């Protein structure tokens, strides 16, 4: 599923550039993706659209509150992902309403806990869905697969 999300980001400049779900499913199948993964990705994207629609008016509202995670959220997200979400928020990349969308979509992911690499893809897709301008350094970090980093 996550490979499909990255494929969509790389091939469609905005969500509006994506074709209708049935056409998109055919294109993804032609690109070699499995039908089960396509269904999962389309379902996940549908959930993203629903969540975004509910939160769109809140996206511009300033927030100075601190997010407290429930035990189940903490187990599903894991320490690394929660830390990364906090990093994006403190860097001004992820306003509080978009943070909530990232958390919602991470909780909808099939793995527990959600790996840091998958959390980065989720954050990328949430920002993409909002057509947010993403700084190049942030984009690099979001697309980094967390492989071994070379120290200089």
Curated annotation (Swiss-Prot):
Family the UniProt entry places it in: Belongs to the Smg family.
Protein name per the record: Protein Smg homolog
Gene giving rise to this polypeptide: smg
Pfam families in the cross-refs: DUF494
Record's signal peptide: none
Organism of this sequence: Bordetella petrii (strain ATCC BAA-461 / DSM 12804 / CCUG 43448)
Stored InterPro entries: Smg
């Amino acid at each position: 599923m996550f490979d499909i999300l990255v494929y969509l980001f790389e091939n469609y400049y905005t969500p509006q550039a994506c074709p209708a779900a049935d056409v998109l499913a055919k294109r993804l199948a032609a690109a070699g993706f499995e039908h089960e993964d396509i269904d999962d990705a389309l379902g996940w994207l549908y959930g993203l659209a629903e969540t975004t629609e509910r939160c769109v008016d809140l996206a511009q509202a300033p927030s100075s509150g601190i997010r407290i995670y429930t035990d189940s959220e903490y187990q599903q997200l894991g320490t690394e992902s929660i830390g990364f979400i906090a990093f994006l928020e403190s860097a001004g990349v992820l306003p509080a309403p978009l943070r909530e969308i990232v958390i919602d979509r991470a909780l909808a992911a099939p793995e527990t806990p959600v790996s840091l690499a998958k959390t980065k893809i989720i954050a990328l897709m949430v920002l993409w869905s909002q057509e947010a301008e993403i700084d190049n350094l942030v984009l690099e970090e979001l697309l980094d697969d967390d492989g071994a980093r070379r120290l200089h």
